[in-house]
């Protein structure tokens, strides 16, 4: 086991014990990472594949348990390898958070129609798990045409899609006054939404304040509002500032990375590649990889292939697949096919768009036409009647 320093947009920091991941070129290492190549290798070697699957379910290999997808990946592999629901349930107590992947995989099997998985879940999950979910919501929600000052004070509405649209587009003087009032106190409800909305409106009046605050490495909820401000500004305003902040030893660098992920140009490539070569932060790597994907004219970038094969974080592999698809002419013949079996929907979607039209790919596209993810389904169905993307 290894201890890894984790953090989030609010500035929270903690240390988490993560499983040791096998080398990326081994069957176990690929199955742990959720790679399509791992799924295919496991099916080709059922004995080793079964052992790898059960090892992953016993010792959850995910770098981020909250967001990384594995349950459907492991459930489909269990079906292909004829691993029973009982074998999966034996990998850990599903009421122990260290083994929630077992419960998630059993759930994925039950959705596929496995009655044994459904019965095992019913036996082991306490009824109290569902009591809060079944309760009728009773929170008071003001109508979205209410005064903006009232809406920004409601913690359950501050990120509502329609409210954010109103914040971005309103010309009402009272609304604008309420919007600016909400930025006065970083600890008040609505602060983050107000800051993001003003940035999207092109209001650059907070740049100096945001830079000063981020230089002090703020923590807690206010950090998210300050950190999200610069990336929401138009590129003409944010990119010059991001280039100045890039590499600074404080939270300004985090904001700069987010801007480069959205708006990098050829001018930024050398600095991005140099940073990617030495970066040990998975979240930073995600932004750096996405930034390279914005500049296909300077590619291909060999380091993106290494990120694709080695990344333990499946979101990072998804970002590298998307970047490779636009920057590497050989992507269709190297990684695109395995992407069709990847654990992450975004990576499967990339594969559906770019994989060559082989018999194996056509069969897999027919399966993905019924994928759980709508974007994957749409991409697969388009490919079944059309050529790969270029």
Tell what function each PLM region has.
Residues 122-126, 366-372:
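TPR/TPR-like (Sel1-like) alpha-helical repeat modules
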Residues 1-20, 28-51, 55, 62-83, ...:
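Structural detector for internal amphipathic alpha-helices that build alpha-solenoid repeat scaffolds
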Residues 362, 375-376:
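A generic membrane alpha-helix/interface feature
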Residues 332, 343-346, 375:
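HEAT/HEAT-like alpha-solenoid repeats
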Residues 24, 50, 173-176, 207, ...:
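Core helices of alpha-solenoid repeat scaffolds
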């Amino acid at each position: 086991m290894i201890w890894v320093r984790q953090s989030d947009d609010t500035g929270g920091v903690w240390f988490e014990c993560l499983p040791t991941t096998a080398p990326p070129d081994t069957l176990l290492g690929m199955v742990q990472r959720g790679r399509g190549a791992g799924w295919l290798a496991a099916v080709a070697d059922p004995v080793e594949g079964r052992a790898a699957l059960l090892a992953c379910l016993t010792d959850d290999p995910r770098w981020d348990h909250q967001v990384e997808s594995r349950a459907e990946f492991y459930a489909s592999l269990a079906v292909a390898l004829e691993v029973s629901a009982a074998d999966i349930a034996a990998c850990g107590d599903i009421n122990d958070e260290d083994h929630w992947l077992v419960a998630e995989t059993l759930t994925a099997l039950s959705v596929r129609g496995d009655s044994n998985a459904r019965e095992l879940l019913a036996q082991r999950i306490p009824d109290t798990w569902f009591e809060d979910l079944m309760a009728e919501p009773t929170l008071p929600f003001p109508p979205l045409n209410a005064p903006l000052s009232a809406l920004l004070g409601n913690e359950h509405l501050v990120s509502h899609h329609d409210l954010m649209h109103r914040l971005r587009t309103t010309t009402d003087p009272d609304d604008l006054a309420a919007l600016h009032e909400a930025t006065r106190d970083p600890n008040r409800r609505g602060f983050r939404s107000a800051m993001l909305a003003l940035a999207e409106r092109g209001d650059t009046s907070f740049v100096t304040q945001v830079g000063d605050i981020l230089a002090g490495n703020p923590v807690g909820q206010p950090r998210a509002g300050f950190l999200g401000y610069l990336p929401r500004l138009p590129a003409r305003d944010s990119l010059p500032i991001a280039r100045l902040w890039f590499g600074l030893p404080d939270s300004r660098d985090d904001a700069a990375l987010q801007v480069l992920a959205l708006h990098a140009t050829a001018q930024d490539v050398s600095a991005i590649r140099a940073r990617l070569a030495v970066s040990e932060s998975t979240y930073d790597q995600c932004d750096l990889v996405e930034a390279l994907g914005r500049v296909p004219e300077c590619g291909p970038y060999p380091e993106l292939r290494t990120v694709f094969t080695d990344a333990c974080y499946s979101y990072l592999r998804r970002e590298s697949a998307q970047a490779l698809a636009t920057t590497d002419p050989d992507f269709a013949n190297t990684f695109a096919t395995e992407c069709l079996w990847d654990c992450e929907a975004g990576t499967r979607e990339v594969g559906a768009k770019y994989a060559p039209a082989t018999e194996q790919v056509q069969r897999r596209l027919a399966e993905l036409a019924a994928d759980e993810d709508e974007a994957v389904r749409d991409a697969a169905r388009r490919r079944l009647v059309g050529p790969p993307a270029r």
